[in-house]
Amino acid sequence: MEIPKLLPARGTLQGGGGGGIPAGGGRVHRGPDSPAGQVPTRRLLLPRGPQDGGPGRRREEASTASRGPGPSLFAPRPHQPSGGGDDFFLVLLDPVGGDVETAGSGQAAGPVLREEAKAGPGLQGDESGANPAGCSAQGPHCLSAVPTPAPISAPGPAAAFAGTVTIHNQDLLLRFENGVLTLATPPPHAWEPGAAPAQQPRCLIAPQAGFPQAAHPGDCPELRSDLLLAEPAEPAPAPAPQEEAEGLAAALGPRGLLGSGPGVVLYLCPEALCGQTFAKKHQLKMHLLTHSSSQGQRPFKCPLGGCGWTFTTSYKLKRHLQSHDKLRPFGCPAEGCGKSFTTVYNLKAHMKGHEQENSFKCEVCEESFPTQAKLGAHQRSHFEPERPYQCAFSGCKKTFITVSALFSHNRAHFREQELFSCSFPGCSKQYDKACRLKIHLRSHTGERPFLCDFDGCGWNFTSMSKLLRHKRKHDDDRRFMCPVEGCGKSFTRAEHLKGHSITHLGTKPFVCPVAGCCARFSARSSLYIHSKKHLQDVDTWKSRCPISSCNKLFTSKHSMKTHMVKRHKVGQDLLAQLEAANSLTPSSELTSQRQNDLSDAEIVSLFSDVPDSTSAALLDTALVNSGILTIDVASVSSTLAGHLPANNNNSVGQAVDPPSLMATSDPPQSLDTSLFFGTAATGFQQSSLNMDEVSSVSVGPLGSLDSLAMKNSSPEPQALTPSSKLTVDTDTLTPSSTLCENSVSELLTPAKAEWSVHPNSDFFGQEGETQFGFPNAAGNHGSQKERNLITVTGSSFLV
């Protein structure tokens, strides 16, 4: 900020040099050449202390204060306590045309120049008019530098005005030249001998050639009211002398060159609307760069070729050069960190990361992380097993838990070279080996040749690898342990551990996709089980449990078989038959209308007392109870009482269900009806049965079960005595494999059956016991020729 900017188009002071000061001193007044009505232009510089807003008062504040009205300079002031300071302001007057009157002439010929120093609220005494006695009545703070008429012979174009003012008992030299006002501390020799500046207030004009001077240095004449400026409306506490001098220096100079006194030199920023002051010159220069940088001025450029960075200060350039030299003088003090930085600012930014290290803490290992993202990435390392096997293909960074998973992934890199494609309609999978395609085709055909040989298991699989993986359950090979402390769970498969690990996160990421269902689960298996509830439509069920006392439905045969093994304890031999029984004829289509005459309890009792053939009895019981095999009770009741024709080729019974043998309903004429339903004790003579004309009934994978035709060796049945036995010669039986079209290995082995009539018992009348044999399908067909007899109570039929 230059003072000429505040005083634009200012006139030049005209005055001559030389001449003395007359004793009587004349008043300075307007020259005759001045235009009428023209008054000097007023400029106000208002220094203020820190208590009033700082030493650098904005220029717009000063201009606002200059426009306000105020009391007269010499108006009476209220008395203030001693020691209080006064605010003050200086008025700069632009010179106007005219000449200063010469010495001895009593007339002013030249411009009028007035500089007023107005006292603050601390003025004392009553002032009215001129004070011949000097400034003593006005107090120590009266400041005045009023040029008086002086004889000037030849005023020059570059004349200067100088004077001395006292501010808070400190004398300052005042110089006004070419429109520029300068204040400076006077040298020691400039003071008069014996003067006491702190005790003698005065208004002093230093003598200088060419300028009018006051006759009495102490005079403070009354000024015209039109030259008085407004006074600050509200009085403020008096600033200290040093602070007031600093404020004055900040207001009066762009660089604040105010002399060598301590605390006086201040440097004011010249930028508009800035007003900041600085105690040292280099501080002002540094501050000016902030204004120039906003205008694109960055004078400090990096000297290294190819860099091109520019900076506003040399310090920033020096700091930048450290990055080229790889110098990192600022090291992180955190223990175990070891990082260093080129600037302290980067170090502070790095230290904030250490301050936030405890914000996100892992609950498993108590390790801390600065962000939630890093904590989440760390937690996955706890809940996922180690993945030591990495893909070796270029550009692929995937890792796997097992070698088999890695091999499976590697095949994906050879998709273009695969030659074996699935020919099943709708399936376009390809494989690099024929054996893999063969395993895949089993998923379409339903073939599962790899059977688990563990006792009571019965699971089968499409490949050996799946079977070996399944056997881990039987061996209790739980090689995948949960790493969470206190959990202790282990799993046979890695994918099971991964699914379990999600439960430790406390989240439920698996959401039911059914519209309107908001169920959420922490494990995928739980979601799978839940999803079945939405499929409980009757039309979607495919299989029903074959056990008559169970009404459960299943969507697949596999789930039905699992249910039978776990819930009904069905053996694997029956499960093997059920798995292959895809074309069994429903028993409801084969039974007669009189099927319900026998209850389930009576059917179970038929197979309850089988000595040494428990598995066979359980098998047949399950078949009967499941509804696969049924018995026509009415036909059984009349089996042995039917009429045998003369050709001895009567059927024992009609083939209804495979194990049931029916006879004709007409009882033989030679036998008493009471033999079967009464109390008379009669019996058959010993006779033999053959299988000449046996009608075969095919039951599919269960094998061919024969309806035997009973032949009597004699034309008429002979009466039986209690000691007689009816035997069946197995040598005369024709194997069923030759009587049916489909040969089944599970065909029941023909057994030698005997009817033993116990002595001292009624054969049929008194609910006698008839014994006949059932073969054991699970036994050895070649080694066993005879079977133990089954005791049947209430009725008799032959299988």
UniProtKB/Swiss-Prot annotation:
Major localization class: nucleus
Residue numbers spanned by region Required for transcriptional activation: 572-699
MF term (GO), any: transcription coactivator activity
ZnF C2H2-type: positions: 267-291, 300-324, 330-354, 360-382, 389-413, 420-444, 450-474, 480-504, 510-534, 543-568
Region (Required for interaction with ZXDC): 267-573
Gly residues bias: start-end ranges: 13-26
Domain of life: Eukaryota
Keywords recorded for this protein, A-Z: Activator, Metal-binding, Nucleus, Repeat, Transcription, Transcription regulation, Zinc, Zinc-finger
Cystine pairings recorded for this chain: none
UniProt GO BP: positive regulation of DNA-templated transcription; regulation of transcription by RNA polymerase II
Any one cellular-component term (Gene Ontology): nucleus
Stretches the record annotates as Disordered: 1-89
Cellular compartments annotated: Nucleus
Tissue specificity of this protein: May be expressed in brain, heart, kidney, liver, lung, muscle and placenta.
Family stated for the protein in its record: Belongs to the ZXD family.
Annotated function: Cooperates with CIITA to promote transcription of MHC class I and MHC class II genes.
Matches recorded under PANTHER family: ZINC FINGER PROTEIN, ZINC FINGER X-LINKED PROTEIN ZXDA
Assembly description: Self-associates. Interacts with ZXDC and CIITA.
Protein known as: Zinc finger X-linked protein ZXDA
Organism from which the protein derives: Homo sapiens (Human)
Lineage: Eukaryota, Metazoa, Chordata, Craniata, Vertebrata
Gene name tied to this protein: ZXDA
